[in-house]
């Protein structure tokens, strides 16, 4: 598994120690790993398989990572059961949603009529392409104190 350097540096700047977890399938090993963590950051990556939330895969779906799905869907409930902070970025928030019983819109353009160009950023990556509004009274609003801009590289969206 590849993790971008900026994820690691952000955890360090926040006072944490980043730990990469191997993608295991057995519950005992996963539990042992989770028991040694203070928080869980779910990084970006490929699409969550639609079968994980009870749907057939549409032709417009992007690249998926079945092994990662298995691992993350195993450890997320363990982290939540321990009241562990869990933070998802891109794919991470999507798999967190699925783990908590949610579904995804597989392809924003074909299912919702919103042009994919708005949501699948071309290089250079990282440039803001749309506005993010923070819920009033949320921890994000308290930290950022204003709405912001974000990049976007996924056709799927939380349903």
Named regions from a protein language model:
Residues 1-87, 98-100, 105, 109-145, ...:
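N-terminal beta1-alpha1 cap of cysteine-dependent amidohydrolase-like domains
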Residues 90:
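Conserved G/P- and acidic residue-centered "switch" motifs that form tight phosphate/ATP-binding loops
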Residues 93:
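The feature captures the ABC ATPase H-loop/switch
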Residues 150:
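Conserved binding/recognition cores within well-folded domains
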């Amino acid at each position: 598994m590849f993790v971008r350097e900026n994820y690691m540096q952000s955890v360090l700047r926040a006072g944490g120690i980043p730990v990469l977890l191997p993608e295991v399938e057995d519950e005992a090993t996963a539990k042992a790993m989770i028991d040694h963590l203070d928080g869980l950051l779910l990084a970006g990556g490929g699409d969550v398989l639609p079968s994980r939330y009870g749907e057939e895969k549409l032709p417009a779906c992007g690249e998926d990572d079945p092994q990662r799905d298995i691992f993350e869907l195993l450890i997320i409930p363990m982290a939540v059961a321990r009241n562990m902070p869990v933070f998802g970025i891109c794919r991470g928030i999507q798999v967190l949603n699925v783990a908590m019983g949610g579904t995804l819109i597989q392809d924003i353009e074909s299912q919702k009529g919103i042009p994919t160009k708005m949501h699948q950023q071309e290089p250079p990556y990282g440039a803001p392409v749309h506005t993010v509004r923070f819920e009033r009274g949320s921890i994000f609003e308290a930290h950022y104190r204003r709405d912001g801009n974000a990049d976007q590289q996924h056709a799927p969206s939380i349903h």
